[in-house]
């Protein structure tokens, strides 16, 4: 049974609109990832946005591996925890309530899924008589249990929408679970919660009071992995058809049989490859911060567990095919992005295998110092810096008969958790509070595509703290809402417009510093010059720099096409910034661009500019736009009707930004820099229009200055002459400072060539290496003054004397210390006047140990 499909079809038959899964990177700036089915509808539940439809249903992909909701460390060791999962849900936005929600849930569970009624139990909130009364129409009273706020009351935060909830439980059988926690409401696995119905009927105010909502709503959630396992009659999510093909593939790769009790590593890898494949397919990239860092941790945890299974080379990228095979029927983009995703995973795996080897060296070094208890600090460093899981470290110690200072490790882990908790402040910068609700519904039309000036009315005013006000005094900053606005709000990488607000007579009353979008409201940040009043008739004037912004925005579209044509279809936009004087474009590509590729890309864009291609801007249904081949950004929210910007057959993109009317207006295009952003993501920075002219002028000035510096009109010839002079001088210095190994004082002791001497200049290590090459048995120690200090270096070959011990013995004579390997060691000292004594000490030590 395709439960996902059955669920969506069932609720579609009940007049629910099917919504596709929203991106894993949410619009909500307080969340790291989409972690529940209701996240895409949060603004509707809070009243910040009107509902487009009264009823909705979805199968939402979710991640819980960072921020507040973090299941990462439990994954693999329980039957239910996952980093990636799918949440089935049905939602009512002020339409139906408890009666229908309960009836729908019961009908789906018993008639569509055909779960046996005798296995089902229900819980309600201890105060919810209404819900219990409705449930009694379907189940016996003794199968309905009441619980308190901890189990059966849901709220979004300290304030806001909230309400009691009702949960449906499935009894997996006493024959399988007989532990002390295996009762309804306990922590055991016998009674599994399969569906949570939230009755959003209150709003909690800042005083903590519960106020009835005028239009109560419904939010439900059922985990697909859990209900699939129940329907298939298995006791663990990992034994279901969603995971077993992956576990079988891991078994084939590792040549190890999967046994449930010993199979945590199999389960970790199976779970993590799903999360990694989906996140990469949706445009999240490996990095050292934010979402990219969580992605990196998930992959590396999977690799570490592969290491436990004996997989010592990249393997996870091979499993991405299986993820696409299992889930690509519903999420077609998994197939579309598969080859790029596999490249990205493999590159990250290769990078981590180098780290594992470095970690093993640290482990071996600490092991040599350990008698019974291994350092918790080193174990934490292995975990935190080198990505070693605690169980891997403990397994290696167990083989050596050693124990770990686990208490110290846990202390450091707790400190890290506290730091991470304090550091996580969300990922966006929009206002999370304020009087925006007061402005919703007011007319706010963007007219900036057609004109840069507009006669309009200030319909709303907020101060800098986003609180409603009637006016702004001179010098005061605040946000204005205009009935018609020519100011473009920051979006799609294009910065927000600046400009002026004038009275009709022409008097300037405010500077527009920026324009942003809050909850679909185009609002401009202003600084008042004169008093700015609500409901005042004004003229809004966009700064002339907008024309330069438009040039750079159009150039990014053409650049995107150039990259896909020259580098390959795997290139997708990962981010952009469009300003008046520059552009920045991030794109997926596994390696740096060479000079030839950069030149080809630059030439392509300039050829399109020279062709003078007319820009065609048209609004059309999104399906038609996709048929035309319009490129859309994964994760961007598009309506049923979209704006398409075309430059002939060169570029077709969905875009709400401002553009030139003809490619010739861009003028010229120069790439100023190509660099890496993170693993698999490159960045191009470029200029066009007047910025390109200014750049060319600055280059010309630099060339003139360079010509003067090298005293040659032909700069390249002048540089070549300077390089030749430097080369000759370096050779002279080398000739002066080199010391012949034959000139050094040496003697033979017990058949071993012993060299102990002071050298004035030269590379000590090279001299020692030359001596080693010349002798089968050698002990050498050299001293060299370096200002007020002294450097000692020693080498040994074919003898029992150890250079590290020799240096440790002699260094204190010159007031220093050091050490190293048996074959080479170094030390430093602060008393160069005692080199003579040190040479004698070195000779005595050599006689004693040779």
UniProtKB/Swiss-Prot annotation:
Entry EC no(s): 6.1.1.7
Record's catalysed reaction(s): tRNA(Ala) + L-alanine + ATP = L-alanyl-tRNA(Ala) + AMP + diphosphate
Keywords: Aminoacyl-tRNA synthetase, ATP-binding, Cytoplasm, Ligase, Metal-binding, Nucleotide-binding, Protein biosynthesis, RNA-binding, tRNA-binding, Zinc
SMART domains, A to Z: tRNA_SAD
Note on cofactor: Binds 1 zinc ion per subunit.
First-level EC class: ligase
GO cellular component terms attached to this protein's record: cytosol
Full protein name: Alanine--tRNA ligase
Gene symbol of the encoding locus: alaS
């Amino acid at each position: 049974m395709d439960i996902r499909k059955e669920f969506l079809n069932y609720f579609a038959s009940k007049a629910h609109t099917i919504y596709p899964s929203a991106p894993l990177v949410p619009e909500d700036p307080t969340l790291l990832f989409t972690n529940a089915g209701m996240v895409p509808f949060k603004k509707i539940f809070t009243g910040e946005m009107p509902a487009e439809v009264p009823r909705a249903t979805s199968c939402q992909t979710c991640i819980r591996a960072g921020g507040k909701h973090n299941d990462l460390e439990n994954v693999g060791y329980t039957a239910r925890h996952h980093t990636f999962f799918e949440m089935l849900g049905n939602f009512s936005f002020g339409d139906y309530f408890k009666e229908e929600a309960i009836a729908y849930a019961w009908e789906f569970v018993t008639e569509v899924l055909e779960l046996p009624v005798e296995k089902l139990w229900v819980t309600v909130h201890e105060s919810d008589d209404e819900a219990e009364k409705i449930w009694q129409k379907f189940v016996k009273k003794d199968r309905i249990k009441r619980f308190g706020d901890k189990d059966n009351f849901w709220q979004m935060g300290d304030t806001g929408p909230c309400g009691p909830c009702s949960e449906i439980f499935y009894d997996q059988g006493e024959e399988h679970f007989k532990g002390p926690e295996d009762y309804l409401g306990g922590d055991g696995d016998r009674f599994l919660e399969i569906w949570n119905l939230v009755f959003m009927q209150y709003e909690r105010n800042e005083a903590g009071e519960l106020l009835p909502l005028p239009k109560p709503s419904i939010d439900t959630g059922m985990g697909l992995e859990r209900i699939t396992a129940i329907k298939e009659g298995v006791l663990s999510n990992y034994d279901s058809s969603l995971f077993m093909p992956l576990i079988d593939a891991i078994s084939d790769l590792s040549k190890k049989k999967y046994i449930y009790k010993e199979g945590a590593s199999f389960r970790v890898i199976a779970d993590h490859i799903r999360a990694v494949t989906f996140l990469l397919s949706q445009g999240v990239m490996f990095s050292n911060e934010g979402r990219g860092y969580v992605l990196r941790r998930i992959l590396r945890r999977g690799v570490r567990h592969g290491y436990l299974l004996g997989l010592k080379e990249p393997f996870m990228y091979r499993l991405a095919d299986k993820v696409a095979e299992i889930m690509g029927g519903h999420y077609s983009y998994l197939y579309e992005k598969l080859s790029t995703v596999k490249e990205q995973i493999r590159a990250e795996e290769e990078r981590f295998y180098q780290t594992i080897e470095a970690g093993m060296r640290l482990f071996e070094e600490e092991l040599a110092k350990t008698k019974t208890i291994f350092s918790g600090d080193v174990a934490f460093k292995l975990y935190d810096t080198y990505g070693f899981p605690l169980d891997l470290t403990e397994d290696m110690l167990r083989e050596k008969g050693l124990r770990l200072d686990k208490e110290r490790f846990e202390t450091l882990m707790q400190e890290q958790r506290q730091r991470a908790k304090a550091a996580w402040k969300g990922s966006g910068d929009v206002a999370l509070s304020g009087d925006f609700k007061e402005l919703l519904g007011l007319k706010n039309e963007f007219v900036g595509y057609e004109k840069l000036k507009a006669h309009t009315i200030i319909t709303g005013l907020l101060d800098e703290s986003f609180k409603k006000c009637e006016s702004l005094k001179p010098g005061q900053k605040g946000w204005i809402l205009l009935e018609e606005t020519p100011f473009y709000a920051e979006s799609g990488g294009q910065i927000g417009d600046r400009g002026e607000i004038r009275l009709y007579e022409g008097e300037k009353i405010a500077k527009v510093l920026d324009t942003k979008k809050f909850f679909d409201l185009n609002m401009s940040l202003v600084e008042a010059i004169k008093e700015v009043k609500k409901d005042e008739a004004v003229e809004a004037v966009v700064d002339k720099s907008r024309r330069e912004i438009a040039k750079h925005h159009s150039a990014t579209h053409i650049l995107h096409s150039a990259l896909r044509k020259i580098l390959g279809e795997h290139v997708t936009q990962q981010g952009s910034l469009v300003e008046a004087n520059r552009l920045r474009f991030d794109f997926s590509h596994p390696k740096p661009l060479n000079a030839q590729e950069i030149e080809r890309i630059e030439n392509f864009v300039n050829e399109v500019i020279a062709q003078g291609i007319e820009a065609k801007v048209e609004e059309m249904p999104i399906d038609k736009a996709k048929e035309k081949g319009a490129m859309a950004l994964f994760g961007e929210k598009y309506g049923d009707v979209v704006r398409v910007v075309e430059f002939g057959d060169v570029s077709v993109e969905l875009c709400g930004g401002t553009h030139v009317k003809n490619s010739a207006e861009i003028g010229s295009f120069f790439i100023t820099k190509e660099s890496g952003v993170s693993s698999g993501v490159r960045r191009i920075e470029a200029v066009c229009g007047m910025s390109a002219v200014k750049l060319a002028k600055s280059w010309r000035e630099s060339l003139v200055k360079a010509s003067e510096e090298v005293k040659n009109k032909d700069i390249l010839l002048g540089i070549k002459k300077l390089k030749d002079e430097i080369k000759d001088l370096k050779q002279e210095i080398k000739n002066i400072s080199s010391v012949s190994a034959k000139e050094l004082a040496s003697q033979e002791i017990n058949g071993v060539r012993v060299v102990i001497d002071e050298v004035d200049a030269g590379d000590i290590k090279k001299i020692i290496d030359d001596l080693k090459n010349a002798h089968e048995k050698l002990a050498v120690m050299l001293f060299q003054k370096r200002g007020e200090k002294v450097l000692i270096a020693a080498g040994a070959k074919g003898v029992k004397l150890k250079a590290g011990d020799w240096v440790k013995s002699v260094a204190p004579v010159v007031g220093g210390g050091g050490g190293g390997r048996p074959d080479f060691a170094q030390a430093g000292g602060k008393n160069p006047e005692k080199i003579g004594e040190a040479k004698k000490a070195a000779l005595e030590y050599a006689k004693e140990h040779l």
